[in-house]
């Protein structure tokens, strides 16, 4: 038999206390690190682990162990040895680390000797000017004029990989570039292109990284044309790698937004990695403050609303839920709640932490614009609360909003309201107003029945 005991105020308060989550709980629940690392090279994972470590006041043994496991198979022996000492609480690492260090130094010297001739040639202007876009012709030219062999070219690839494993990303990028100029081995050229992209990311050369993103995209489209599963997997990896320039290089924002919204890539996101919607949504929202092309911005906003709606059953977090609350449910209180949660999520996300303030600013604009569209007279105190601001801050915010957007409105400081001079009601507004009216009548009837 159902329990018909009336719900008391204390029950509501206790329920609210159980539902309320701390910022740390919100961040932990929405941590994407486990999903991201499965699509990143181990060297690209390291900055994400370091970010987590930097957020902790005290060094975390778990993060230190994770770093050790991540890098122990690389040639970064000195750093791995220091991690070992930290984990085990000793001052000196085992002798095997010193032995491995010596082996690595010897191998570097051998690689240097084996590649010296070809790297010197590629550094000479007279040789470089003789090269053409035809790799076969280039090899013939170098073989005929300078006795260069295929083995010499392949040494560049092996040396580049070795330098990468040592953490010498600048040197690795140059070697892989030189290899790519000469090699006709498709598989190795593809691997070298991915490797150079990783190097440019890890050295923060964002313009070069964007060039490599485009090269990898072209390789996926051409070399894997008849392999749809391989294309899907490679696009998934590229999407994750592209997050680095996406939020670190301002000119990359529009380019990567366009890339992610392209049919092949948005299909990949929806099929293989829907959590990327967090980053695409954040990028679209923050674009409000930086784009001059309002038409493009409105299109991207409509697209992200549609995609969030489609994928809500598959993936959601406070960032995508903000879009859902504001544009699909028209629930301003829920939108404000999700904005507060989204701010915590962004602050704990390696890729989005630098965009958190711009995101909140742009999101408040979107709430204000939507709220103003469906109300004739707006209480400043009420709107301020919906924006998470006090009344003074809210008043300044609304003044700036009216000035920046040139909306036709007047502030009545005496009444503490904003009067909107709307054009004749749109269908959108009529539906909202009728819904509000129906909700009000339902409340009145419920109150009457309760009496």
Curated annotation (Swiss-Prot):
Any Pfam family the entry gives: eIF3_N
InterPro entries linked to this entry: eIF3e, eIF3e_N, PCI_dom, WH_DNA-bd_sf
Keyword Cytoplasm carried by entry: yes
Stretches assigned to the PCI domain: 245-425
SUPFAM superfamilies per the UniProt record, alphabetical: Winged helix' DNA-binding domain
UniProt entry tagged with the keyword Hydrolase: no
GO cellular component, one term: nucleus
Entry GO MF terms: translation initiation factor activity
Function text: Component of the eukaryotic translation initiation factor 3 (eIF-3) complex, which is involved in protein synthesis of a specialized repertoire of mRNAs and, together with other initiation factors, stimulates binding of mRNA and methionyl-tRNAi to the 40S ribosome. The eIF-3 complex specifically targets and initiates translation of a subset of mRNAs involved in cell proliferation.
Similarity remark: Belongs to the eIF-3 subunit E family.
Protein name: Eukaryotic translation initiation factor 3 subunit E
Organism: Sclerotinia sclerotiorum (strain ATCC 18683 / 1980 / Ss-1)
Recorded name of the encoding gene: int6
